[in-house]
Amino acid sequence: MFKLGVLLTICLLLFSLNAVPLDGDQPADQPAERLLDDISFENNPFYDPAKRCCRTCFGCTPCCG
């Protein structure tokens, strides 16, 4: 009986982990799309590349962060 319980426990653990669907919206699942979504401060419309700072401090990390 003990061997049957151990075997049943192992099978339930293995197959239950495989049956759980992965969430496709996670960034780790979509590395190519993560590279396309560049939201860095250089793309901020208020960023001044000459000063390497923002004209306004709202939402720009080099000056205000």
UniProtKB/Swiss-Prot annotation:
The modification Cysteine amide is found at C64. The cysteine framework is III (CC-C-C-CC). GO terms for cellular component: extracellular region. The hydroxylation at Pro-62 is observed in PubMed:15924437, PubMed:19380747 and PubMed:22709442, and the non-hydroxylation is described in PubMed:22709442. Residues 20-50 form a propeptide. Residues 1-19 form the signal peptide. This is Conotoxin tx3c. Expressed by the venom duct. It is found in: Secreted. Belongs to the conotoxin M superfamily. Its main location: secreted. Pfam families: Conotoxin. Causes scratching in mice. It comes from Conus textile.
